[in-house]
């Protein structure tokens, strides 16, 4: 597939209808081991045949080289090699071009299969079950035939390959010890980064690991505030949500928050690696107030600061 596989990816704009449906579309692929892997379609710009790469000195682990494609010079990661799988370079014959937090990169894989649509409540976090894959898989879902699909944790892959970006200097918020941000993300890398930003801002924080857990905790807090005759906004000044999460995604979580009067006045900020205009449109459809791409700590603090002062 040297050409762009538009027949496979179709129109991304049409997929904005998924907002609030608690569904996602997964592109299935293999790395030559018989296992099936998946990645969110929204992360993929195109699929093409693997092409000759240029090697540069001191390339990170798992990076086979760089390639020039449609005006972009992008690093190309060999997923089989990155995951410690003994596979010949020739067997990795397809390349998925992904956009992640405004960065574009290629993933070499053995074969790209098809796109499936799944409910987020059928996606389960792996916890520590897949330590053999170095934490590079963060969720599982089951196909109709009973076979499992491992969902790649792109955030962890990129941190493992390229390291973590420094958050930078973040000013403390006046009276921050009396302010609180509730955040939810299924990625341990993301939670660590968010916590670092909030710590530097000097504000209190509460967190959950997926949308379902977040909504359960938020409902309990809302019920407690209501019983006490208090406003929940006095306890939580902002809610930060990821887009992709097992069991309940950030779009459905936002819908729940925005349709519940007890959360009136609490802004919802979507903090996501899905940085395309289509994803922003999906967020707006369900009531997201602000959008911040991962992992720009300064942008995150700049977005939260006026919300905390309100």
Predicted regions and their residues:
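An acidic, low-aromatic, low-complexity terminal/linker signal
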Residues: 1-230, 234-239, 243-252, 259-267, ...
């Amino acid at each position: 597939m040297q050409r762009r596989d538009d027949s496979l990816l179709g129109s991304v704009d049409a997929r904005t209808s998924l907002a609030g449906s608690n569904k996602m579309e997964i592109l299935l692929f293999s790395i030559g081991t018989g296992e099936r892997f998946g990645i969110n379609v929204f992360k993929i710009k195109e699929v093409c045949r693997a092409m000759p790469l240029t090697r540069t000195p001191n390339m990170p682990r798992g990076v086979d080289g760089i390639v020039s494609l449609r005006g972009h010079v992008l690093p190309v990661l060999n997923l089989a090699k990155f995951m410690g799988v003994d596979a010949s370079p020739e067997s990795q014959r397809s390349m998925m071009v992904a956009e992640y937090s405004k960065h574009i990169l290629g993933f070499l894989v053995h074969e790209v299969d098809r796109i499936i649509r799944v409910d987020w409540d059928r996606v389960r976090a792996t916890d520590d079950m897949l330590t053999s894959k170095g934490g590079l898989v963060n969720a599982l879902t089951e196909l109709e035939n009973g076979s499992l699909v491992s969902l790649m944790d792109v955030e962890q892959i990129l941190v493992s390959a390229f390291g973590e970006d420094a958050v930078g200097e973040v000013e403390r918020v006046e009276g921050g010890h009396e302010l609180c941000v509730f955040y939810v993300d299924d990625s341990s890398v993301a939670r660590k980064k968010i916590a670092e930003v909030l710590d530097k801002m000097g504000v209190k924080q509460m967190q959950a690991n997926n949308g379902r857990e977040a909504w359960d905790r938020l409902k309990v807090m809302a019920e407690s505030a209501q019983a006490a005759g208090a406003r929940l906004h006095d306890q939580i000044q902002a809610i930060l949500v990821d887009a992709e999460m097992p069991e309940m995604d950030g779009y459905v979580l936002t819908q729940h928050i925005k349709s519940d009067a007890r959360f009136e006045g609490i802004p919802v900020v979507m903090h996501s690696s899905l940085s395309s205009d289509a994803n922003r449109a999906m967020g707006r459809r369900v009531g997201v107030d602000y959008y911040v791409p991962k992992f720009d700590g300064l942008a995150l603090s700049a977005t939260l600061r006026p919300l905390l002062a309100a």
